[in-house]
Regions:
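Alpha-amylase-like alpha-glycosidases and glucanotransferases acting on alpha-linked glucans and related
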Residues: 10, 16, 54-188, 217-445, ...
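Conserved alpha-helical elements of sugar-nucleotide-dependent glycosyltransferases
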Residues: 26-27, 194, 323
Length: 517
């Protein structure tokens, strides 16, 4: 990974006339803009289909893509939808936000129409996709079709025969729900087709894609339903223990995530085959992967199932470096960003260092006056080169919102570090972005909202809350020429410019000959 810069913007946050960011013309225009702004990377959030709460970190599958990302414009061009049909659908009235309720009610009927008009059963490309991805697609498509048949309830509430995947039940539902299953396969085919076209365009224009995979999978997922042996489940396929975080200075109860925990002894016996397959597949979709909650590979927090808080949990040992040695032997060296934030011990630091993966630094964590002063790991003078610096992540306040919310003494600490006691408070975000850009971190990634100077009304997610998360998106027109030039200049000034996209200033041989003549 060369010294460079990137921008964090979820696919959902792209502007769109149809209610949510997707693989439409806006995505290609954003790639063009990244190129003009001197960027090398576009970081996104997990691509999977979201469940209740709309979090991309709680997905129905670790392999499937979110059908909401399928471009309706592309389906119109293909002739399987009309512009009138799409314009008549109600996706919500606010251009800068996402109405997931209306999205569910309007998007799927349109996608179903597109499927019914596509005649995919005679499409060789579709048939090849289904065959090549049968190892995960078959279970996922059946899972989604059965879930729809049971009114969307979790698989743990399905009828006993299909809940436990008895052979006769699997055969029955595959016959009974044939067209619903084919519809789900069609959605994944279109997702993959459009995503690969977008990725190819980005790579052709010098932009690499940073994907994101959660360490855990959702209990209500095709993965747990189809492969209960991978997880800490009891005889009824219910969790024995679930994931979360212990109490800390921010939460007296800790965080209860509820994801099933892995049976790491079983994974070790199989040579981590499921994990290797998961990572290999994810690297087909993205150039670099950020692995969420990396500290969970060193130690993970185990909470007895049924607890209402995380107070009674305890730490257990994870697979450690063994998993990543197996990964490298199977896949070769891959570019990973280790999300090593939160409660970090010396053991976690050793794992990150031993893996060789860059860890993460977040400027918003650097100026807490209750913390370790100048020894704070997140202060730029303490960075090593092999790290990725962010002003904030999707889980943090925007940098402007953070400046507005921190205590007075922390704000003074910011000004002291910047040697800036006179700039208006509303302009400090630019100084913090510049500080991140000039740090020795190999890669600097800035959330789009921070470059735009937006406050917390444009925050992506507030952990441990529900309701207004994952909804923000660009309206269109915000990425002005002035902003483009400012970001390009920052990249050039601090040695992060993507030179592969810069026009050469050296004349070619024909031009030189013409000058001589």
């Amino acid at each position: 990974m060369d010294r460079g810069a990137g921008i964090l913007l979820p696919i959902t946050s792209l502007p769109s006339k149809y209610g949510i960011g997707c693989f439409s013309k806006s995505a290609y225009e954003f790639v063009d803009w990244l190129k003009e702004a001197g960027q090398s990377y576009w970081q996104i959030l997990p691509l999977g289909p979201t469940s209740y709460g709309d979090s991309p970190y709680q997905s129905f599958s670790t392999y499937a893509g979110n059908p909401y990302f399928i471009s309706l414009e592309a389906l119109i061009e293909e002739g399987v939808l009309t512009e009138e049909e799409c314009d008549e659908a109600d996706f919500g009235e606010k251009p800068g936000t996402i109405d997931y309720g209306k999205m569910y009610e309007s998007r799927y009927p349109l996608l179903r129409k597109a499927y019914e008009r596509s005649d995919v059963s005679h499409n060789p490309e579709y048939l090849r996709f289904v065959e090549e991805n049968r190892w995960w697609l078959s279970d996922y498509a059946l899972f989604m079709a059965v879930k729809d048949r049971f009114g969307g309830v979790p698989w743990t509430e399905w009828a006993e025969d299909i809940r436990f995947r008895w052979g006769n039940a699997l055969d029955y539902y595959r016959r009974e729900l044939y067209f619903d299953i084919e519809f789900q396969q069609y959605l994944q085919y279109m997702f993959q087709k459009q995503w690969r076209e977008l990725k190819h365009y980005a790579n052709e224009n010098g932009i690499r894609l940073i994907g994101d995979i959660p360490i855990y999978v959702s209990m209500d997922s095709a993965d747990v339903w189809a492969h209960p042996e991978l997880f800490q489940l009891d005889g009824e396929n219910m969790p024995v223990a679930v994931a979360g975080c212990p109490p800390d200075g921010f939460s007296a109860d800790g965080q209860l995530w509820g994801n099933p925990l892995y049976r790491w002894d079983y994974h070790r016996q199989t040579g981590y085959q499921w994990w290797i397959s998961r990572l290999e597949y994810s690297f087909r979709l993205c150039d670099v992967l950020r692995i969420d909650h990396f500290r969970g590979f060193d130690e993970y927090y185990s909470i007895p199932y049924g607890e209402e808080t995380a107070v009674n949990g305890h730490w257990e040992k994870g697979p450690g470096i063994d998993l990543f040695r197996h990964m490298e032997r199977a896949l070769g060296w891959k570019e990973v960003i280790a999300e090593d934030l939160g409660f970090v011990t010396d053991s976690v630091r050793r794992l990150v260092q031993e893996s060789g993966f860059p860890g993460m630094k977040v400027l918003e964590f650097a100026f807490d006056t209750r913390d370790s002063g100048s020894a704070n790991d997140y202060l730029p003078h303490n960075y090593i080169e092999n790290c990725v610096v962010y002003t904030g992540t999707h889980d943090n306040e925007t940098i402007v919102g953070w400046i507005d919310s921190i205590p007075k003494e922390d704000l003074e600490s910011v000004r002291d570090y910047l040697c800036d006691h006179y700039s208006p408070k509303k302009q400090l975000y630019k100084s913090l972005i510049s500080m991140a850009m000039r740090s020795r971190a190999k890669l600097c990634v800035i959330p789009m909202q921070d470059y735009l100077g937006y406050d917390n009304t444009c925050r992506i997610n507030t952990p441990s809350t529900v309701g207004d998360n994952w909804k923000w998106r660009l309206k269109g027109g915000e990425l002005t020429d002035k902003l483009t030039d400012e970001i390009h200049e920052l990249c050039k000034r601090y040695g992060r410019l993507n030179w592969s996209n810069e026009k050469s200033t050296v004349p070619d041989e024909d031009e030189e000959d013409a000058e001589v003549e």
